[in-house]
């Protein structure tokens, strides 16, 4: 049975958060990026978090949010971890005294190891597919062979993962965790319970 951890990202409904928890997900992701079809309001986020059972990590995803916007969200929503998906500097990421993940959009020629060193206080790096002008949630995979074997940060693998390819991804990359959004959806922002169950079964090798 795989010990790889998992996050279901882009949660917008209480029932989807509960489905993720019941299927064995370790974390849920809440998107605070207004341009995303999976964005949630503060009120939505609070209701979702209030409905969660214990020991589910809540991750807030931000894209180039201002300090004021982010602090207002943190004052109102009980987030366990931050996920920065934009062009935030290490200093900006460090400025909220919260554990954080830095997303890196991977393409050929990138020095992922150097990026890990740059964001030295990140708890992990989320490796996602590079699509110009799109900060994430593309639904496309990237060449996993581009990921170095000796990164000094836990790797959270994202980008086009589904129940059909996540076992292969885990075997090849050996990530700390996998992150899925579109791969478990009926439509953008609306999760599919059966797809969540199938994805988690593939992650756990059951």
Curated annotation (Swiss-Prot):
This is N-(5'-phosphoribosyl)anthranilate isomerase. One of its GO terms (molecular function) is phosphoribosylanthranilate isomerase activity. It catalyses: N-(5-phospho-beta-D-ribosyl)anthranilate = 1-(2-carboxyphenylamino)-1-deoxy-D-ribulose 5-phosphate. It comes from the Bacteria. NCBIfam families: PRK01222.1-4, PRK01222.1-6. Keywords: Amino-acid biosynthesis, Aromatic amino acid biosynthesis, Isomerase, Tryptophan biosynthesis. GO terms for biological process: L-tryptophan biosynthetic process. Disulfide bonds: none annotated. Belongs to the TrpF family. Its EC number is 5.3.1.24. It is an enzyme of class 5 (isomerase). Gene3D superfamilies: Aldolase class I (3.20.20.70). Pathway: Amino-acid biosynthesis; L-tryptophan biosynthesis; L-tryptophan from chorismate: step 3/5.
């Amino acid at each position: 049975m795989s010990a790889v951890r998992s996050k279901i990202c882009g949660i917008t409904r209480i029932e989807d958060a509960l489905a993720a928890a019941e299927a064995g997900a370790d974390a849920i992701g809440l998107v605070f990026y207004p341009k995303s079809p999976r964005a949630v309001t503060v009120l939505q986020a609070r209701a979702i978090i209030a409905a969660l059972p214990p020991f589910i990590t809540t991750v807030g995803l931000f894209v180039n949010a201002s300090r004021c916007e982010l602090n207002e969200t943190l004052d109102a929503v009980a987030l366990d971890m931050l996920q920065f998906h934009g062009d935030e500097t290490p200093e900006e990421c460090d400025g909220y005294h919260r554990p954080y993940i830095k997303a890196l959009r991977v393409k050929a020629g990138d020095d992922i190891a150097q990026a890990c060193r740059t964001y030295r206080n990140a708890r992990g790096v989320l490796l996602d597919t590079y699509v110009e002008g799109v900060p994430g949630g593309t639904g496309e995979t990237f060449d996993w062979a581009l990921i170095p074997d000796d990164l000094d940060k836990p790797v959270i693998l994202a980008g086009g993962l589904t129940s059909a390819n996540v076992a292969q991804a885990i075997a090849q990359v050996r990530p700390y965790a996998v992150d899925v959004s579109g791969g478990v959806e009926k439509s953008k922002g609306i999760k599919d319970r059966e797809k969540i169950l199938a994805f988690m079964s593939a992650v756990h090798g059951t």
